[in-house]
Amino acid sequence: LIFSSGETFFSSADLIKRDFKEIDSHSISLPNAYLKQHNLTKEKLIRRLKKFSELKICIIGDLIIDEYITCHALGMSHEDPSIVVTPMDSQKFIGGAGIVASHAASLGASVDFISVTGEDEIRNYALETLSKNSVNAKLLVDESRPTTLKQRYRSKNKSLLRVSHLYQGAISIAHQNKMLELIKQGINDTNLLVFSDFNYGCLPQSLVNNIMNITKNHKLFVAADSQSS
């Protein structure tokens, strides 16, 4: 497991492959102060990770798809003060609560993921990718909103433009009730429920309150990650 600042950039697929094959183990060190502060050891972490395969987790929250569009900059426009680019490559990734679900599944847990999407091609991409990640995705369709998509246009390792396709309004009462039913259906087998809230309307306070009432009755452990992006 390697942690980094996330600021490494590569100019080609060959460089990416070479860099990951030739990782210098001498540059990797353990955060000993953190481990000591939290009384963590390698043996304890291994035991915890092995127990993940025994867990049934329900994750509910905002699904986000991140798309990175690599462009070739042609120069400045003669008509207006804007940059002209040609898209060269595009890559999509599961993000938001979807990546939380994918990480939990990759550690061996059985994962149900509940969210809301639009009726569009991005939804289809999400369903296919989450299935490959061994996530049982239960994505309700809301035709009043798009599936949240964040596009980043980049050139020479710099972001030129960000475009967000989203709707931040709260989901309807009807969709909230459908989510509650999905949670009730699997709650007897669930060990952990995770709220993953990115403030895009999937978790209005009324829904959270109703879910908490259900989890209290079943003495279910609940974790929450609330943020804006």
Regions found by a protein language model. Name each.
Residues 1-5:
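Conserved C-terminal "lid"/linker of ANL adenylate-forming enzymes
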Residues 9-11:
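N-terminal beta-alpha lobe that positions the nucleotide/phosphoryl donor
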Residues 16-74, 79-80, 87-229:
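Ribokinase/PfkB-type carbohydrate-kinase core domain
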